[in-house]
Design a protein with these regions (language model features):
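A general structural signal for short secondary-structure boundary/capping elements
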Residues: 50-55, 103-107
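Acidic, metal-binding active-site segment of PIN/NYN-like and related structure-specific nucleases
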Residues: 44, 51-52, 56-73
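Acidic, PIN/NYN-like endoribonuclease modules and their adjacent C-terminal/linker elements
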Residues: 3-35, 45, 70-124
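Residue-level preference for short coil/turn positions at secondary-structure junctions
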Residues: 1, 52-54, 79
Length: 124
């Protein structure tokens, strides 16, 4: 199955692995394993545009910058393929919690239109 979600550099490989432990074949790849790690140090706009071309949503913790850049791309009619961000209440080292939140959410959200959409986990 083609990966539909990209875990950003602020997440751990353990997070992606935990998602696949909960659900075998879960469609996520860590940024270090995508495109040979070419986007590990990429600026947010470049990463969002590359993900748009690949049809992949970004998953991560970049609450300060990602929404701003995603919104700018949308306003400029360039768009993005979707963003899922963890709220401050989710610890960056709580891989199991991150995985449970994402796998549960993705069961509901996988078929949504993700173009220019930003979601936060956990949902209110």
């Amino acid at each position: 199955m083609k990966a539909l979600l990209l875990a950003d550099e602020n997440t751990s490989h353990r997070f992606a692995g935990a998602c696949r432990q909960i659900e075998a074949g879960f469609p996520i790849i860590h940024i270090a394993d995508w495109q040979g790690g070419a986007y590990l140090s990429a600026k947010d706009p470049a990463l969002l545009m590359a993900l748009r071309e690949s049809g992949m949503a970004l998953v991560g913790f970049g609450r300060a910058s990602i929404p701003m850049h995603a919104g700018k791309l949308t306003r400029e009619s360039l768009g993005h393929a979707g963003v899922i961000l963890f709220r401050r209440s989710v610890s960056a080292i709580a891989y199991g919690k991150q995985a449970r939140l994402l796998v549960s959410f993705w069961g509901e959200a996988a078929d949504w239109d993700w173009a220019d959409r930003i979601e936060y986990l956990p949902r209110p």
